[in-house]
């Protein structure tokens, strides 16, 4: 990988906040260094628990995972630590730990999630997905980065804050560790409504994002929204012999392939009419992604052209993107000479900031139904909608975070958009309109979150803990949220 400085990432002003001027930054670094091996070992213990919030996986593992997280938080001296929801209620187990503010100090909410994505084929991993391994300066394993690293970053930052400032720092801290984020947070709105007072805060940190490059401290300032859908195409009502009926009758996979092909134009840009596409906008307009570096980061094969129009950052952050993430048809190994009557696909549509997700879902449905190949039956089921997100970087808590990131990495921090989605940010914005919501994280282009061989860059992780601990200390010294 090239030096991150070659990516032309402009520095962000990192003026020391007045309420942080007296902090001994080196004391925080030293405290993190003392704790770091222990933190990584504890992270490895969390990685070993295969807590997956999908229906086909064992829910008992999620309970184990929540109990392990609760035990870590109890050890840090929180006044209350509870696993929610209670038995018999809907939703997979989350953990809420709270210590109230004292002396008029603000309260912060630290979010992460303990559930993980399925590992895929374990044999495809270099090492077992649920056995954390250190290798080449990284920690490998499912959830090592997304998002059990976020869980342990919160635990470690709270630990370091207490070690350096003492237990009477006065900052109100609530840690909320969700248990079904990778399943789309289906119960988040209801959970938030039931626990609104418990989760109330002046500033919120969502530790579930990434850095621009290894070695570049980053605050994510915008996210695309999301629409998830399943489309099924059917041409006949039963299986047919491919020799006896092939020709006049097209099989389900062919019909579906033709329908999917209408979703992009000849340049590879999304062709769903009416979707907002900010081709000329790069978010904050500052970061530029070198195409050679992008191809290396993404593993694009030689000779394969990149899709879409406009700058790479606009294609990643401010334009829609549509991917086929699942496809059901007869498997190659069990196929016979028959015409399959139907096929279906799962679609993931990322929508630009400013696009209403309900409208985007309607536009996607209308496109699919109006482009039915050869008049085939097309059924569309919308399974998920989530709005885009943008944060106010002029807020004091945001300025504190940009400063803390710069100090932790000893280099200027940057702001970036992200093509992914965290749908519940809109719920948090609605519930707590005065709170600054800050999206941080420790993934990088080599992390492969959700993929085979997920990993965490350990030195950046060390710095991320320093940054969060410094931010907490700055918040403790502030009279404002």
Describe the role of every protein-language-model region.
Residues 248-249, 334-341:
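Short, solvent-exposed beta-strand/turn "edge" segments of beta-rich domains on protein surfaces
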Residues 2-122, 342, 346, 359:
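N-terminal helical capping/dimerization or prosegment-like subdomains
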Residues 169-251:
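Histidine/acidic-residue-rich, glycine-tolerant segments that coordinate divalent metal ions
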Residues 105-177, 463:
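Active-site metal-coordination/substrate-binding segment of hydrolases
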Residues 232-234, 256, 339-343, 396, ...:
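Zn-dependent metallopeptidase/amidohydrolase metal-coordination segment
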Residues 350-352, 379-394:
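A short beta-alpha structural unit
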Residues 242-327, 355-377:
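Acidic-enriched catalytic cores of C-N bond-cleaving enzymes acting on peptides and small amides
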Residues 217-221, 332-337:
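Short beta-strand/turn micro-motifs at beta-sheet edges
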